[in-house]
A protein has these predicted regions:
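A structural motif corresponding to the C-terminal lobe/cap of the Radical SAM core domain
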Residues: 1-13, 34-36, 46-50, 133-151
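Conserved short histidine dyad/triad with adjacent acidic residue
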Residues: 41-45
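Short, small/polar residue-rich loop motifs at catalytic or cofactor-binding pockets
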Residues: 51-55
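Short, acidic, Ser/Thr-enriched surface-loop or helix-capping motifs
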Residues: 60-61
Length: 159
């Protein structure tokens, strides 16, 4: 639908928020359809850095509990009624918070080997945890093929 509107001269800004694999997908499609514009798309995707839960995105619930994002309600880093948000947010002595700030070093499997890690940021860690009970396991909702995630490396598998 977005492409159809764009082709009709009615460009729309589209925000996808629950699967950061959409970024590489859109870039790869743009590379085929409009290589010049694909460069701009890639720069924007790199600037955004994909999922930013625990870094650029956070959630303060109604009771003051601080979470990595709105989906991490089962894990609190502290309460703004007891400590300032800035203190809670920058406290990397809490293991999960520290790792979320530098999650590229902790993701496993195909996420760790993915050439798009700088673009998607490892996708949703909370979804990986919900399915595998491991925050750092690959996000099960990543629909990119092994070939697509290895394109920048010139390989064909990310096992």
């Amino acid at each position: 639908e977005t492409k159809r509107l764009f082709d009709k001269g009615k460009p729309k800004e589209v925000l996808t928020v629950d699967n950061h694999a959409d970024g590489p997908y859109v870039y790869l499609r743009m590379l085929k359809e409009d290589p010049e514009r694909a460069k701009e798309v890639l720069e924007l995707l790199k600037w955004n850095e994909g999922n930013n839960s625990g870094r650029g995105i956070g959630c303060v619930s109604w009771d003051g509990e601080v979470h990595a994002d709105q989906f991490w309600r089962h894990h609190s880093f502290g309460n703004v009624k007891e400590r300032p948000f800035s203190e809670i947010w920058m406290d990397t002595s809490e293991e999960l918070m520290g790792r979320l700030k530098n999650k590229k070093e902790h993701v496993k499997g195909r996420c760790a080997a993915c050439s798009w890690l700088d673009v998607c940021g490892g996708n949703f860690r909370v979804r990986a945890e919900a399915i595998s009970d491991d925050v750092w396991a690959p996000d099960p909702a990543c629909y990119l093929t092994d070939e697509e995630i290895a394109l920048a490396h010139g390989t064909t598998s990310c096992d």
